[in-house]
Amino acid sequence: MAEMEHAALDEPVRRYLTHATGGRTDLGRRVRLQLHGRVKVGAWLRFDSVWEGDGRSFSWRARAGPGPLRLLDVHDQFAERRGSMHVAIRRLTLVDAHDEDTGRSAAGRAALEAIWAPGALLPDRGVDWRAASDSEIVATWAVPPERPEVHLGIGPDGDVRFARAMRWRGRREGYVAFGADVYEERSFDALTVPTRISAGWGHGTAEWSPFFEANVHGLEVLPVQNKPNC
């Protein structure tokens, strides 16, 4: 059944899924990544982190700070309609956000970060696909309370060039384009995923200002029973 659904997809969509999953339809949905990079919070801070996600939930735990120092503990997460962001220095909490706006924004982030878990994007897993052009494909699926429409720019081989979606930013701003440019990819067994990205609000517009740069240096497909370490 999964193979039949795959065959019925537009060619650019098949090209991406075949490239990302090696043509397999039995892959696990959830992955764990080892990430390092830098994030702009006023100044640029370097981080080391672990991310888990499946396109419908995520957990990101990071240690961040200037230079070699990693003074900040960061935990962003989303699952089952609820999102939160917690930042602390040792036991001193600096940020503790878990309101409705945080949850809606985190749902959009969970969908965009599915480029790291392509096993979660197969059509038999509730994802509706269409091709906008030979080099742009669109995936839509439910990430309650949102239903994001994720646009992927792809190359001739199906490699991801960018990911973009309208993501909730807050009651004042509403939905704003958020996305990432992809500079490198790598294969980890059957999966081929972006491994060097820059991301930010206003993607695809003159207002784009990346504030997050990340490099993936490890990937593990997790058993079905594993959930985010919330």
Identify the role of each PLM range.
Residues R14-T93:
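N-terminal mature ectodomain segment of secretory-pathway/periplasmic proteins
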Residues L27-Q34, D54-R61, A132-T140, R161-F162, ...:
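Short, hydrophobic/aromatic-rich segments at coil-to-beta transitions
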Residues A139-Q225:
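Gly/Pro-enriched, hydrophobic low-complexity segments
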Residues A64-L69, A88-L94, A165-G170, A199-G204:
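Short, solvent-exposed aromatic-acidic interface loops
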Residues M1-R24, V182-I197:
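Amphipathic alpha-helical packing elements
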Residues S49-G53, D76, G126-A132, L152:
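Short, exposed beta-strand/loop patches in secreted or surface proteins that constitute
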Residues H86-V143, E173:
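Flexible, processing/modification-adjacent segments and terminal tails
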Residues G37-L45, S59-L69, A111-R125, A139-P145, ...:
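Short, solvent-exposed secondary-structure boundary motifs
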